[in-house]
Amino acid sequence: VSGTMEHEDSLGNKGVIQSMGCQWMTAGSGILHKEMPQPSERMLGCQLWVNLPAAKKMVPPAYRDIAPDDIPVVMSDKATVRILSGSHRGIRGTLDNSYVQITYLDVTLPADASWKYNEARDDENLFLYLLEGSLFPEVKQQSAESKGCAILYSVPVPGEDTDEPVEVKAGPEGARFLLLSAPPLKEPIVWGGPIVMNSREELEEAFRELRNGTFIK
């Protein structure tokens, strides 16, 4: 979001993530990396972990960084929407992840402006994560009034009206938030430190490989 970060990893990749840029890393069968903040007036960023399906857990690792100018921007009502992944209003984002179909939008609203999003599929979970300002849903009895708050929208219950859009209004100082949506995998998750697997046995095996120096394939 703001500030500069240097990246280096076990694949030999080196890159600089600039303000308003992003990186996309697929851990897959294993990758070691380090992120090094550089002197900046302000450092603010988000790290989102996307769980891979069990059948894709051991795909080859990969990395790319994306310059700010390579991220599509559209005006949506009064909102400025940066499309990192998925699509919005017919415009596709820079990231095309074939393993998980995720929509990832960076939305900025001016003071007191409203915004409506009705492109989520019926089988998706969706959440909004507030970065700056305050945000008030027009329907759900929730609000995000401080940085780091989230508003969650889950898969509809069968038989319920699924046509209701996500509709929010910014507070008097405006709002900047992330919108993320994807179908739930409905698979077990076992997490330990930097590793996410589907069973305790898989997790323990990964840590054994780390200790034995065989983690990187």
What annotation goes with each model-predicted range?
Residues 1-217:
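Jelly-roll (double-stranded beta-helix
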